[in-house]
Design a protein with these regions (language model features):
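Di-metal (Zn2+ and/or Mg2+/Mn2+) metal-binding site signature of metallo-dependent hydrolases
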Residues: 1-13
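Short, ordered loop/turn segments at secondary-structure junctions
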Residues: 1-2, 28-31, 59-60, 97, ...
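Divalent-metal coordination cores built from histidine and acidic residues
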Residues: 13-120, 185, 430-434
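A generic structural signal for well-ordered alpha-helical segments
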Residues: 16, 47, 114-115, 136, ...
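Divalent metal-coordination and catalytic microenvironments
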Residues: 20, 92, 156, 197, ...
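Structural motif
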Residues: 22-24, 52-55, 89-93, 119-122, ...
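Histidine/acidic residue-rich metal-binding segments in metalloenzymes
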Residues: 73-93, 99-165, 172-194, 205-219, ...
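Active-site microenvironment of metallo-dependent hydrolases
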Residues: 205-221, 225-510
Length: 510
């Protein structure tokens, strides 16, 4: 998901190619969620002018959410009948376990179409095991990038999956997952690859990209050449593109990294498509972003809000409410937390002392005007609000805050600006990161976006948060494939029950 870096394809290439990343496998699904197939063709055209190759997997469906949320474009089985025949299509992207388990019509249709076109099916199966995993694999999924520990990795590999070990800026699984190779069975390395999934511009500039994962694997005890194979030929074979890339031999594309020391694995020079394109962590030529069409101008098609939109009304005047607060225990762990909150004048009052604040997702594509509202914990905001239109998987507008007034101000500001990320306090903007391309990415230089990322996180921490990436933790909330709770424009979601829930558990009038 290059879009989570908030960098456009052009800017992303400027950041990652000098670190040795020459190809990316992606569904480009965030771009699709805010545009349509015409928008996708624009991104394909942008890729062709970049030194970074993108091997596209057609998203198994959009939206990815259960129950279904709102996006700009719905990717259905009928769409698959067309796009799987495109030359850009190399498979079906990130098929989530629950959609197979529930026999979702579009998902099974996409998989069936892939069988007709001899295309591989890529997976997303966090914490799947036993019979649930067996049934999932029978659908034809060949690989996964969602394992929380090495035991999960080993089970999936023993059942025939190719495993991508993920190390993102908020999920640090590589050291633990690599134990499958360093402690259980070194021969498993042949079917292990790497995945960054979601990384910020800051992370890329400070640590690197795929080269960083190679170094981390070596540090974890993997032989340098084996770690390099994980980042090259193993990945190419997993995605069935090894006839094009992944090795230096006749008939393959000349993507070559020049490295002095395999142990340190610091990339000095990069060749893509037979041309020297990067040296000393910089491209050797000027790369310009394309002129953006109206599809990606970033207009938010939603009405201005008021504080009342973010006030939780209940049918008692005064008293107490027992609420279910979505409690973040990590970027991909959301648990239930029951909290007693005061009710005043018919409105449930957020309580910063109990770390129980409000969170909402506002539909921004002009489809239905949905605004969900729920309670959340873990951010420890004492004041203000923060909001983002970069919010996978739907990229609706997510806002959270200690009070309804600042939440409304943050939403209205992003509507005026055409998208981005903002932190506000007492009706004033503390920091703003503009994302003019579809409301999700920027054509600015990676260094510029990274500097703004740092200021946004610093501003969020000034409101009281002690999370490492407060904004990123927030904008992951709409992902319903993460246990145990999520929030979309359709409402708060119970991952286990695959349905929305009422956050008000009990009311006591006083």
């Amino acid at each position: 998901h290059s879009e989570c870096s908030k960098l456009s394809i052009t800017s992303y290439a400027k950041a990652v190619v000098p670190h040795g990343t020459t190809s990316m496998i992606s569904g480009l699904d965030e771009y699709i969620s805010v545009s349509d197939l015409d928008g996708l063709q624009e991104i394909f055209a942008e890729v062709k002018k970049s030194p970074l190759k993108v091997f596209w997997g057609a998203p198994y469906k959009t939206p990815y959410t259960v129950p279904q949320s709102t996006v700009s474009f719905n990717f259905t089985k009928k769409v698959h009948q067309t796009v799987q025949k495109w030359p850009e299509c190399f498979g079906v992207w990130e098929t989530v376990t629950e959609f197979v388990q529930e026999e979702d019509e579009d998902t099974l249709g996409a998989i069936a179409e892939a069988g007709k076109n001899n295309l591989p099916v890529f997976g997303c199966a966090p914490m799947a095991s036993g019979k649930k995993l067996n049934a999932y694999l029978c659908s034809g999924v060949r690989l996964d990038h969602e394992s929380y520990d090495h035991v999960e990795v080993v089970e999936k590999m023993r059942k025939g999956m190719h495993m991508l070990i993920r190390e993102s800026c908020v999920t640090h699984f590589l050291a633990e997952n690599m134990r499958a190779v360093t402690e259980v069975n070194p021969y498993l390395a042949r079917r292990v690859s790497f995945c960054t999934d979601d990384v910020t511009a800051t992370d890329i500039l400070e640590k690197g990209h795929m080269d960083n994962l190679v170094r981390l694997a070596i540090k974890a005890g993997v032989e340098p050449m084996t770690a390099i194979q994980m980042a090259t030929i193993n990945s190419a074979e997993a995605y069935r593109i090894d006839h094009l890339i992944g090795s230096i031999c006749p008939g393959r594309i000349a993507d070559i990294l020049f490295v002095e020391d395999l142990q340190d694995f610091k990339v000095d020079e990069v060749m893509t498509n037979g041309n020297m394109v990067a040296r000393n962590h910089k491209l050797t030529y000027e790369l310009k972003a394309p002129e953006r069409s109206p599809i990606f101008k970033g207009e938010l098609k939603c009405a201005k809000t008021t504080a009342d939109d973010f006030s939780y009304h209940v049918p008692i005047e005064n008293g107490e409410a027992k609420v279910l607060s979505l409690d973040v225990k990590g970027p991909f762990v959301r648990k239930r937390r029951d909290v007693i909150l005061k009710v005043k004048d018919g409105i449930v009052q957020p309580d910063t002392e109990q770390d129980a604040i409000m969170v909402s997702v506002v539909e921004r594509f002009g489809k239905n005007g949905n605004k969900s509202l729920a309670f959340c914990s873990g951010w420890k905001l004492k004041k203000g609000a923060m909001a983002s239109t970069n919010a996978p998987d739907d990229n609706n507008l997510v806002v959270m805050g200690a009070n309804a007034e600042d939440m409304s101000f943050a939403v209205n500001y992003l509507i005026e600006q055409g998208g981005g990320q903002v932190v506000v306090e007492d009706g004033k903007v503390i920091e703003f990161l503009p994302l003019p391309v579809g409301g999700i990415v920027s054509d600015d230089e990676p260094e510029v976006v990274a500097a703004k990322e740092a200021k946004i996180d610093e501003a969020a921490r000034s409101l009281g948060s002690d999370l490492p990436n407060p904004m990123m933790y927030m904008f992951f909330l709409p992902i319903t494939a993460i246990p145990d709770y999520a929030l979309t424009d359709a409402g708060p979601v119970d991952y286990c029950a695959l349905t929305t829930y009422d956050p008000i558990l009990e009311l006591v009038e006083k």
